[in-house]
Amino acid sequence: MSNEKTNVAEFVSELQAGVFEQQIATAINSVAGATVEHGRGGEVVIKLKFKHIPNTAQVNIEHSLSFKKPTKRGSSSEDLTYDTPMYVGKGGKVTIFPQDQMDMLNPQAKA
């Protein structure tokens, strides 16, 4: 097994072409602000489901974001779900591009 690990920050930024990362930030801000304003707790849940794409070294990642924030008289919630296909490289490293893809700007470089 390789020592290479999935870069989590890069991984999250690639989900739904960066939109998912922005939605996480918005949910955190919204829930934290409402929690302070109303004095009751909130919740942000991120869920990842992996399914193999047959005959490839890829997985389809279903990524879900749900959050619940307190309001003046109760709470409000939202659920979002998207899919992003990604490559699985050596040791299970997950990336948006294959690890052995040639650098198109520098064909002499090693992958």
Q: Can you name each region flagged by the protein language model?
A:
Residues 1-15:
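Histone-fold modules and their flanking histone-like tails across chromatin and transcription assemblies
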Residues 3, 60-62, 100:
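N-terminal functional modules and adjacent low-complexity/disordered segments of proteins
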Residues 80-111:
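Mixed-charge, glycine-accented linear interaction segment located at domain edges/termini
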Residues 12-52:
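Contiguous, amphipathic alpha-helical segments that mediate oligomerization or scaffolding
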Residues 36-76:
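Short, structured protein-protein interaction patches enriched in aromatics and acidic/basic residues
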Residues 9-12, 62, 83-85, 91:
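Generic secondary-structure boundary/loop-capping signal
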Residues 8, 19, 74, 78-80, ...:
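Compositionally biased, non-globular sequence tracts
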